[in-house]
């Protein structure tokens, strides 16, 4: 079964210059720009393409998508009487935009500058821990998403690498998702290939525009054509939410261990992933990518404490989620302890 959400995507160099056309298409006459605190100059450059439609700029987007930022953005939209908004950025700004759009039904255009892929999912959340609010709505999806590789060339390599591995996690888990289909399988494999190919080129030259385009294309494929996620996402999300580790880097750390654990139960998925990454041991290849990119390999490097492991096991074991290999609390403990230590995965 293949079901497509209605979402308009513009991909390619210079596509951001067409944002005025997109605003017109979606009947946005009073547009607010949403960005992070340090992206005011970028917002001004985008505003030039929107002309008189722009009624204001909100820099209320914050890392971690706190509830206070959500409230501030909603208030800004109301104060400006905006009938649409443009969100500039990656995971956190887009995440907040989705929650705001779901709550207000005000449409938005996403201008993507990282590889997180959040814009392709109708799931949203704000806050963390006991304060987290979450949901899923078609109104959380952007009316249009613009992927212009030129907007990613100034993203630092370390941030790019972590974001790409976050996207890689979407692709890998789609290869063994319970609702995968031939389209998802083919495009998830291609996503992994593009991402794996782009990273060493970006390390050599972060301004390599062809590598940037490959990474952005791979991230879009991984996010737009995905199956239900399993162990890797469950562990990474629970660790991030409960222990305050950074989102993309947490996904990058956990992915090789989840892939290695699931490999015996998902041989076809591992065959596809091996083709994409050019290795006989794809889980080790994922680990080696983290090492080559200078990313953390262990959760201990991200601020998690060894004393946190039992709680992490408890919260993961308490959730129901699909996974190709059966999971016991002992198995989850093994995965998390290996991911904490950061040595090459061994199962």
Stretch-by-stretch model annotation:
Residues 1-83, 299:
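ATP/NTP phosphate-donor binding region
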Residues 7, 102-186, 191, 272:
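A glycine/threonine-rich phosphate-anchoring loop and its flanking beta-alpha core
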Residues 16-19, 39-43, 67, 92-99, ...:
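Short glycine/serine/threonine-rich phosphate/pyrophosphate-binding segments
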Residues 77-115:
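A short, small-residue-rich loop immediately preceding and capping a beta-strand
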Residues 168-172, 215-223, 255-258, 286, ...:
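Short alpha-helical scaffolding segments that buttress acidic/His motifs in well-ordered protein cores
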Residues 178-285:
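Active-site segments that bind and position negatively charged phosphate/pyrophosphate groups
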Residues 276-347:
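C-terminal charged capping/lid subdomain of soluble metabolic enzymes
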């Amino acid at each position: 079964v293949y079901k497509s959400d209605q979402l308009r995507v513009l991909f390619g160099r210079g596509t951001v210059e067409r944002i005025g056309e997109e605003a017109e298409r979606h009947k946005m006459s009073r547009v607010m720009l949403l960005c992070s605190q340090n992206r005011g100059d970028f917002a001004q450059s985008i505003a030039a393409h929107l002309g008189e439609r722009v009624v204001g700029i909100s820099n209320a987007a914050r890392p971690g998508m706190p509830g206070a930022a959500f409230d501030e953005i909603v208030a800004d939209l109301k104060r400006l009487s905006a009938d649409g908004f443009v969100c500039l950025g990656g995971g956190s700004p887009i995440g907040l935009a989705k929650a705001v759009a779901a709550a207000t039904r005000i449409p938005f255009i996403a201008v993507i500058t990282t590889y997180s892929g959040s814009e392709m999912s109708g799931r949203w959340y704000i806050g963390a821990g006991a304060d987290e609010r979450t949901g899923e709505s078609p109104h959380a999806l952007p009316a249009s998403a613009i992927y212009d590789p030129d907007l990613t060339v100034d993203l630092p390599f370390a941030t790019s690498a972590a974001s790409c591995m976050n996207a890689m996690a979407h692709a890998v888990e789609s290869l063994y998702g319970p609702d995968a289909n031939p389209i998802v399988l083919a495009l998830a494999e291609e996503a992994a290939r593009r991402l794996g190919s782009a990273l060493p080129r970006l390390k050599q030259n972060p301004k390599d525009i062809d590598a940037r385009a490959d990474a952005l294309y791979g991230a879009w494929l991984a996010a737009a054509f995905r199956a239900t996620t399993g162990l890797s996402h469950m562990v990474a999300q629970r660790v991030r939410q409960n222990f305050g580790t950074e989102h993309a880097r947490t996904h990058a750390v956990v992915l090789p261990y989840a892939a290695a654990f699931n490999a015996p139960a998902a041989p076809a998925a591992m065959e596809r992933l091996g083709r994409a990454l050019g290795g006989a041991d794809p889980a080790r290849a994922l680990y080696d990518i983290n090492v080559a990119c200078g990313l953390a390999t262990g959760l201990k490097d991200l601020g998690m404490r060894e004393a946190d492991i039992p709680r992490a096991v408890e919260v993961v074991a308490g959730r129901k989620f699909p996974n190709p290999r059966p999971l016991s609390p002992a198995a989850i403990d093994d995965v998390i302890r290996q991911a904490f230590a950061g040595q090459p995965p061994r199962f």
